[in-house]
Amino acid sequence: MAFAGTMGKDKEVRFDPCWSQEAVLVVNRLHPLAAYDEISLDDLSDQHLISYNLTGPLGAELTNLVKDCDLAIDYLYSDEITLASMVVGNPDMMAIACRSWLLDSFDQDIKLVRIKEAPEAFHQMYLCSSALMRHSKTVDEFIDIVLDYCSKSLE
């Protein structure tokens, strides 16, 4: 079992939606754009941007988000911790990332700026489990508890 995104349908994996993540611009607090709460991708054409590797679970969503924009983005990274670390280390660099609790530990050094073009539910997260094997009662109860919790948090 895992909480993860999806790379598409897989007959061996059961994907139960749990929550979604918003796409944000991760900005070093020393950068002038840290004064903004929201920004358009069109305003970033002359900025140094980084984001996730397009071969990972965010590739389709990220490609769709920026498809109509003339942006220079280095698609090299696999997680929010690395993206935030790069932005902290270089105030001129910004990252397009999913809003995640992992970014909270960088709060003193970064600002998360909403991206106008990004849907609120940019990236769907799932509780993933085996679709082929029978689960123990404990695992089934855990799945039920998680899905119940997730459904209530979405209300």
Question: Predicted regions: what is each one?
Answer:
Residues 26, 51-52, 77-78, 95:
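Active-site-adjacent beta-strand anchor residues
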Residues 47-69, 99, 103, 135-143, ...:
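Secondary-structure junction motif
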